[in-house]
């Protein structure tokens, strides 16, 4: 089975680099000039400078060429996934689609698996998620991810196809749990970053991380996810990484909020849109998610970090 990665950002490029260690891989960029530069210089200077592209990796802006491959990894931001699927529906028809994004669509409240099912019904789909940074994958550092697929046979095939020497995949059929874990941790990471940025200390971050994880479990259970999925790589594992590293864009965005510093809005911060989607879901479902709701308000500028923390600390006392 042949592989193409659609999306030449940092994560898409990193996946393509890793997979090219096993055989030919196509990386598609929607920008012809970027594709030409990457193909000629053998480097993604903009997103992953200093990391060479293997000889087995072909970069192209020709979507028809890329979609001749059997398995397509969709490395696009969550809020742009539906548009890409709709725009290129004919080219994607009949292919196996693996979403490589994390988040909840703002307008619909759906995750990547549901968006793919709604946009391209009948398509065989999966989700690649878990604790990882593009630089680590591209450098060949040991990384473990979750491959979520409702079809066990397809899941086994994809697990074997996409596992590399240093990228190990664990599979699950719980696509709901894997989707929610990868999405919700970004919201909590913004809160943890804001906490540290405002100088509130590691103890406060530990409290936010732990109580945030309780919110993740609460919503996931209500949506039908299995508890063990949230305890795995796509939930707790991703949460721990994202809430503690400056390499996380969501955590860095929170740091900037806490320090009252500007942040590059051109940088994709999935947790912002997800926080607003989660706040709406919480209202619709009548579920208590105070940290996620507060992060949404904080990202809007409705609160300062100090005001947000006071609001959380002044909530009614309860059992853990």
From Swiss-Prot:
Sequence positions that bind sn-glycerol 3-phosphate: 102, 130, 132, 185, 238, 248-250
Taxonomy, superkingdom: Bacteria
Binding-site positions, NADPH: 11, 30, 102, 134, 249, 270
Catalyzed reactions: sn-glycerol 3-phosphate + NAD(+) = dihydroxyacetone phosphate + NADH + H(+); sn-glycerol 3-phosphate + NADP(+) = dihydroxyacetone phosphate + NADPH + H(+)
Principal subcellular localization: cytoplasm
Associated pathway: Membrane lipid metabolism; glycerophospholipid metabolism
UniProt-annotated catalytic positions: 185
Xref: InterPro entries: 6-PGluconate_DH-like_C_sf, 6PGD_dom2, G3P_DH_NAD-dep, G3P_DH_NAD-dep_C, G3P_DH_NAD-dep_N, NAD(P)-bd_dom_sf
Keywords of the record: Cytoplasm, Lipid biosynthesis, Lipid metabolism, NAD, NADP, Nucleotide-binding, Oxidoreductase, Phospholipid biosynthesis, Phospholipid metabolism
Family: Belongs to the NAD-dependent glycerol-3-phosphate dehydrogenase family.
Function: Catalyzes the reduction of the glycolytic intermediate dihydroxyacetone phosphate (DHAP) to sn-glycerol 3-phosphate (G3P), the key precursor for phospholipid synthesis.
Name of the protein described by the UniProt record: Glycerol-3-phosphate dehydrogenase [NAD(P)+]
Organism: Ruegeria pomeroyi (strain ATCC 700808 / DSM 15171 / DSS-3) (Silicibacter pomeroyi)
The gene coding this protein: gpsA
